[in-house]
Amino acid sequence: MKKIILFIIVFSSTLSFAQITLYHNVYVNSEDQSKFEMVERDYMSKLAQKAVNDGKFIYWALEKVLQPSNAMGGEVNHQLVGNWYQFVIVYSDMKAYLNAGPWWSDTDNLLGVPQELLSYKVKQGGMYLWHIKDSAMVTGAKFSAYNFGFSEEPSKFIESQKEYKVFFENMNKTNQNGRAGWVSGVRVSPKNFGEHNVMTWDGFLTLEDAMNHWTNWVESKKEYKKIHLPNGFDLKMIAAKIAETSAPSN
């Protein structure tokens, strides 16, 4: 396990189709999770909020992956052992992503806390850059259900999602089945043939709502073929929001 000084990079209530979302994954052992979450929630979220207020990006969050509770990325994702977390940052466009700079670094002046006191133990995972293509958003989601797959025709996959968008928009209006948002996107980086290159995100109000979504989901080859995803969504995750920013205060 590698000890690092806080380095944060890595979703949202108002989306435009130029938006870029960065996910930065880290693995935290069970015994280190309390400090890790405290540092991010009580300290680093303040730096993220300042960056939002300054227009560097639109949204920042830390999510804890709850499901699946098995081996992922070479580590066991289970509360008794450790969990994957992901930092989530939403930028207005690619230019904003490229120009954001090291917004997390000025802890001494902005927080009054030396950066070395905010260090913790994590194992670095990957960083994944996604382009948001469509959305049906409302506020209030506290749990995220992610679906990842590979399509040889990602543009056709995105086009196929339009009918689902209308369906989810209607559900979001009354939070039917606990729904609180939906997004579709394509991966920008890393960009390797055969790896996950399309995704959808479903927001939910409670963990029970998110788990019921899985329970009631009937998958079929026919439906996957219809959306140009022959092997289906072969990775699904449910994550809880640990900390997040709010709308700009200025």
Locate each region found by the language model.
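Sec-dependent N-terminal signal peptides
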Residues: 3-16
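Short S/T/G/P-rich N-terminal loop/turn motif that feeds into the first structured element of a domain
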Residues: 18-250
